[in-house]
């Protein structure tokens, strides 16, 4: 489909006799920019690639030649790194977890930038609103904390700690073990991905609703009054989405830090 909403592409207005074409799942499907055989390179792929390049380019510019007194990009970069370290990593992992700082910094800024595309003209799509990209992020996190647990605790000890949370009566184990294993191995990554996807998906739908309503209601008659109200709501929702985009990157990275912390050592 076209990147332009149907209501805009069709020139449909409330007094032109056509019904309101509400946003749908079709607004999350994109025609390939180009194809190589059966592989199609789509807009979300491009935005994800650009997000990665932006993160790499920014931190390269900030820290390739660090100065004793930080200025410009280095100053902003240090603020970002310190934010992740002091607000996300240290509260859960302590100083012993500083080795995971590059991973958490990269994860936080990569997700944040992918979310920010929603409010950038022309792009106007949050990449995690396409659930496949949320699952890719979850897969990276899952592989990381499972690997950390196996390496740091040993496979058998790690599995035991996943299945049995501390001291519990023996008679409850047949019920507790499958529930804990499912929760830690399956439910945990599932909820992590769905939370990010659902928030970005819902936010994008809201923006589409008010954006298409603005166009649909626009005319020389009374519809213009309602169109103006809808247009104002586009800016209100955009401001709200800016906060949500940051919070979702923060929550996703914070939960990742807690999972890694749980893999480093058993809970007591």
Set out the residue ranges of the language-model regions.
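Selective transmembrane helix interface/packing segments
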Residues: 2-268
């Amino acid at each position: 489909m076209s990147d332009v909403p149907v209501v805009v592409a069709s020139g449909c207005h409330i007094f032109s006799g056509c019904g309101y074409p509400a946003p749908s799942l079709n607004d999350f499907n994109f025609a390939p920019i180009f194809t190589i055989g059966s592989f199609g390179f789509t807009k979300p792929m491009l935005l994800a690639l650009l997000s990665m390049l932006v993160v790499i380019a920014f931190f390269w510019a900030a820290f390739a030649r660090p100065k004793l007194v930080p200025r410009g990009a280095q100053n902003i970069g240090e603020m970002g790194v310190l934010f992740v370290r002091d607000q996300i990593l240290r509260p859960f992992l302590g100083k012993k977890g500083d080795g995971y700082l590059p991973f958490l910094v990269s994860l936080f800024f990569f997700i944040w930038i992918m979310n920010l595309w929603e409010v950038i003209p022309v792009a106007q799509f949050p990449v995690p609103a396409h659930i496949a990209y949320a699952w890719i992020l979850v897969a990276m996190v899952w592989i990381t904390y499972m690997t950390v647990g196996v390496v740091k605790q040993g496979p058998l000890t790690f599995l035991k700690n996943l299945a049995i949370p501390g001291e519990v009566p023996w008679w409850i184990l047949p019920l507790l073990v499958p529930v804990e294993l499912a929760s830690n191995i399956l439910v945990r990554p599932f909820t992590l991905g769905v939370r990010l996807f659902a928030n970005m998906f819902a936010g994008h739908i809201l923006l589409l609703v008010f954006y298409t309503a603005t166009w649909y209601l626009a005319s020389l008659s009374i519809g213009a009054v309602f169109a103006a109200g809808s247009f104002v709501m586009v800016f209100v929702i955009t401001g709200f989405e800016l906060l949500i985009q940051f919070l979702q990157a923060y929550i996703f990275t914070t939960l990742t830090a807690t999972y890694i912390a749980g893999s480093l050592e058993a809970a007591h």
